[in-house]
Amino acid sequence: MEIGWMHNRRQRQVLVFFVLLSLSGAGAELGSYSVVEETERGSFVANLGKDLGLGLTEMSTRKARIISQGNKQHLQLKAQTGDLLINEKLDREELCGPTEPCILHFQVLMENPLEIFQAELRVIDINDHSPMFTEKEMILKIPENSPLGTEFPLNHALDLDVGSNNVQNYKISPSSHFRVLIHEFRDGRKYPELVLDKELDREEEPQLRLTLTALDGGSPPRSGTAQVRIEVVDINDNAPEFEQPIYKVQIPENSPLGSLVATVSARDLDGGANGKISYTLFQPSEDISKTLEVNPMTGEVRLRKQVDFEMVTSYEVRIKATDGGGLSGKCTLLLQVVDVNDNPPQVTMSALTSPIPENSPEIVVAVFSVSDPDSGNNGKTISSIQEDLPFLLKPSVKNFYTLVTERALDREARAEYNITLTVTDMGTPRLKTEHNITVQISDVNDNAPTFTQTSYTLFVRENNSPALHIGSVSATDRDSGTNAQVTYSLLPPQDPHLPLASLVSINADNGHLFALRSLDYEALQAFEFRVGATDRGSPALSREALVRVLVLDANDNSPFVLYPLQNGSAPCTELVPRAAEPGYLVTKVVAVDGDSGQNAWLSYQLLKATEPGLFGVWAHNGEVRTARLLSERDAAKQRLVVLVKDNGEPPRSATATLHVLLVDGFSQPFLPLPEAAPGQTQANSLTVYLVVALASVSSLFLFSVLLFVAVRLCRRSRAASVGRCSMPEGPFPGRLVDVSGTGTLSQSYQYEVCLTGGSETSEFKFLKPIIPNFSP
């Protein structure tokens, strides 16, 4: 047993030489079944499930089905029960003609796993045709001097049935001169010959009429009749003789009509009319009569119709030569039809799986069979597909192939393949057949959603309205269908203290993000969280992205003045010596703004002043300085209103009110002390005098010290202040008041100024200077 095949991976061609003998064991043999022709449609033939040893459900789940050559469905299989039934009435004569036995080959194909079982159905002949003679009357011219025992051939009857149902016997009507002798062709057909048993005498009986009856072997037998007319003629001594008893010729199939097949020749030694020969086909079958004709004068045998090797491979033709006297001779013409490569290969698709899942290698895509009615190399085939496809052709049993995937496929790279099966025979010239297959690739959830960005930065201005759409995230999935449907969700924040659920929400369908409440920049400047995108495949795949939300500041806070305090308490009064030079630092307005950026950039300007032009405010730092030299005409009490404004849109502002007291010298400061009640003044007059005297002495001493200090300070920094004092305009409390540097003069000398209580003539007490510690 030898199977010759060649598989070239680069060319993806499969060369398979199918030899009938070598394929006898290629697949599992199921067996042979038989059915009588003309059996009604739906009749039971066999139970394949039992023959294969399979259960009822296995036949159905494995998609068992019948495959017949040429797509003729003579049989049908009930997969639920395993019953093999007749699909249509079978006419044995139409299916097989004279061939006996009449066998129809079929296969049983089952999937998961792929198995093909070979089987055959034998169609049993019934006696449904009667014998028929091609001629209702046969004329024989028999010389009267014919010797006893001479045989005269008669036309045989035709019966489309085969075997015992074909013609089995011939009978002749009772006659004293003749009897019937039956002979048999090599193909089994029987033909009659008339045997002379008693001498003829033309003068007594010039003509005889007999009835020839043909009987078949059926039960009951059928019959057909023909008339035989015998004309007794005068003596003709010599019968025609052919030059060859057998002529063997070959003719290519598909030869044109009228092609010369052969020329037969006979001779007759008689002269005259008895030596004139005519040629005829002797007892031709219907097929031979339609295929060949002989020229009665020349003996040329020509084609009446084209011969087809695939239908009939050879003909056995008997030719009779008859002379003018009625004598005849016969020869046999053996005509061999030579095969020509005139049939392209045929592809029969048995199973096709589409779509097929991606990521699954070695999947059977299709099962098909290849056949070529030609013979020899003309019937050998090569099967192939395109080079650039991830598929392979594998030979299966007999003439079957399976088309399988070479590797795992990727639907995202290519969702459809158009495969062309090319089957070429080995004849000359080569003929080919192409069969197109479209294979769809079904999606498997093998791609996780992908965000368009790995991180998103969103900007939201504070004081937003709730449910404001602040931005969107977007993810795509290369899969298809439900595997590509993306659902968005918020992932738990990494910061457990971040109330993410109350800050933002996300639309699960489109990824839109919404602020759930109004955001406050001063409370939360920024926050971040993770968003997940999950597809709806099984199992579901997901991916996440980082979202940063930056809260943009809005100008929703007005400047707040830290110094001087504007809380409604007694205002602070700044002391300025009248000897101060222009640019003398009086104080510094300190303010802050809860906003940020430009909204927190503050500018200062003098809004109101008792003496316009006497003081100025630096716009960027809030320092209040003298604009010119002080004069005696300037009022001792000055009231300044400073406007503090931010740089927002629209701008917000606040005002600070300053009280400035112009003094001639620090030894005699002017203090707006409260006037004592008249009764108390009289009771403490002595104390008042003592206090005034002590104050005068102290003032002189203090003036000297301050003068010295002022000179030193002016050398160091003209921007430094010489002192600060809280001077309430109302009554002083009867306790010690500690006034420390709370203004902006943090880098200047500061003094602790204490007022002693207990007398109406309270005095200033200058203590040690407080010198701040500066970091190196």
Curated annotation (Swiss-Prot):
The protein's matches in PROSITE patterns, at most eight in alphabetical order, are given as: CADHERIN_1, CADHERIN_2
A single cellular component GO annotation: plasma membrane
Keywords, A to Z, come to:
Calcium, Cell adhesion, Glycoprotein, Membrane, Repeat, Signal, Transmembrane, Transmembrane helix
Its annotated compartments are: Membrane
Cleaved signal peptide residues = 1-28
Q: Transmembrane region positions? A: 691-711
Domain Cadherin intervals: 35-133, 138-242, 247-347, 352-451, 456-561, 568-671
Cytoplasmic compartment segments = 712-776
Spell out which residues lie on the membrane's Extracellular side.
29-690
| MF terms in GO | calcium ion binding
The residues that carry sugar chains are 418, 436, 567
Bilayer disposition of the protein: Single-pass type I membrane protein
Q: What is one Gene Ontology biological process annotated in the Swiss-Prot or TrEMBL record?
A: synapse assembly
- Give the matching PANTHER family: CADHERIN-87A, PROTOCADHERIN BETA-16
Question: What's the stated role of this polypeptide?
Answer: Potential calcium-dependent cell-adhesion protein. May be involved in the establishment and maintenance of specific neuronal connections in the brain.
Q: What is this protein called?
A: Protocadherin beta-16
Point out the gene that encodes the protein: PCDHB16
